[in-house]
């Protein structure tokens, strides 16, 4: 459990109001909400027949896919950096 103070921020995602509670700054929470809202609108334009629950799942799956690709790339670069740094120590 964290003792960090919690922030409550009201946001609107795809026409629905939400109160998000978290330890991030209000600006960060709004940025995340705007990102999700933008993605939902983007996928809605490409898939206009989807209802909101299916659209939300499609959006979540696509965001998770983007995240996992970025994490794999980060892990690959971090491992490369460790190898290169380890090589410098051997000189």
From Swiss-Prot:
InterPro entries with a match to the protein in the record: Bac_CellDiv_Activator, Cell_div_ZapA-like, Cell_div_ZapA-like_sf, Cell_div_ZapA_firmicutes
Pfam families, per database record: ZapA (PF05164)
Annotated Gene Ontology cellular component terms: cell division site; cell septum; cytosol; plasma membrane
One annotated GO biological process: septin ring assembly
Oligomer and partners: Homodimer. Interacts with FtsZ.
Record flagged with keyword Cytoplasm: yes
Gene designation per UniProt: zapA
Gene3D superfamilies to which the protein is assigned, alphabetical: 6.10.250.790
Keywords annotated in UniProt: Cell cycle, Cell division, Coiled coil, Cytoplasm, Septation
Protein name per its UniProtKB record: Cell division protein ZapA
Subcellular location: Cytoplasm
Coiled coil: 59-86
Upper classification of the organism: Bacteria, Bacillati, Bacillota, Bacilli, Bacillales
